[in-house]
């Protein structure tokens, strides 16, 4: 096992992934793409656990009255408009099967309220305490929280691998464009290759 790697699992939550969720990023209940994403996300978490890699599960949530939401752009205004990811309710909870292991000392949860999972959170401190220098990042949506977090991670000195098939956007073309853009600052690979990269001695 390489001790300098952590996995970031971003927004694997009911409102984002469940067929009855309020966001869903285009992942309809009968969508083959949706099932592939769920399977790949599960494989990423399983792979990380099999190599005893730390996992930081990042969730987005707001007060039910959205008083803590800064509505400075459409992506946030839309969250409040549709009533998504309210704290303490089903929508903001982790999707069943992709949740943290309750009894694990290698899994952590960080809550955020902006685009980057680092902004205004203890994520960087957590990763430094773990000794992480390399990150495997995956989540939904590719072009928002994933790309925002990857760019922030690169700026503060982490080497990043994006597990591309454990990510998704509502529009596959937007997903592909985001991955292409991130390749300037990160590597991208399918889950199986990303896990091998993480587990390899550095």
Locate each region found by the language model.
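Active-site-adjacent betaalpha module
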Residues: 1-6, 47-51, 74-202
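N-terminal nucleotide-binding beta1-loop-alpha1 segment
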Residues: 6-12
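Short acidic, Gly/Ser-rich segments with clustered Asp/Glu that frequently serve as metal-coordination loops
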Residues: 13-19
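A short, N-terminal amphipathic alpha-helix
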Residues: 35-54
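Short beta-strand segments at enzyme active-site cores
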Residues: 53-60, 163
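Active-site loop signature of alpha/beta-hydrolase-fold enzymes
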Residues: 15, 63, 169
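Short, electropositive alpha-helical surface patch
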Residues: 61-80
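A short acidic, glycine-rich active-site loop
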Residues: 26-39, 79-89
